[in-house]
């Protein structure tokens, strides 16, 4: 909607995009080998890093952060472009020092990396990140709970987006209304569909981490429920 990734979307902003509701947070997650010397995001410079495959969410976020940091791919000893399904094995095979992932937690791929070899979750928090979050409403600071993954006992600060269910102005209001009604009339069942959904609250799902205006069909339901004026 905002048109902030010209490489992925050369046609510019997609102003027909509409949010329906947000789901779970997807923190930008950096996992590093314990023997790599990487403790914070700044330590990635000069290391072997999987930046994600072109077009992926983690690659898009990584490129945004790199631009703000003033980094290029040449600042890494290796900038691999592995898919998210390939990077955990590469980390534990010592082919890379760190990997990035924009994902909800707990996540199976990260559990694989942290149980198959000695790996840690890395803090992503510096003045550049603070400004990035302050300047963009669709980003927010996030915390990955300590103890969720082997090797990381304390909470880890990072930032990220919220996974959002979206539609467009081309989808009629009644269709979106019926989808929203099905989800929220059965919210307890919906929350059991994935561990990352467990803490979802309708009051937050309709206002937090929405990167586009709400669809008219969603607004109709929320007003009927008294959740919006």
What positions do the PLM features span?
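Ligand-binding cleft/hinge of the Venus flytrap
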Residues: 8, 58-77, 95, 111-115, ...
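Extracytoplasmic/secreted envelope proteins and their assembly/folding machinery
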Residues: 17, 41, 59-63, 88, ...
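Ligand-binding clefts/hinges and TM-proximal coupling segments of bilobed small-molecule sensing domains
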Residues: 54-64, 137-207
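Solvent-exposed coil/turn segments that connect beta secondary-structure elements
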Residues: 25, 33-36, 54, 104-105, ...
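Soluble non-cytosolic domains of exported or imported proteins
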Residues: 35, 53-60, 82-85, 100, ...
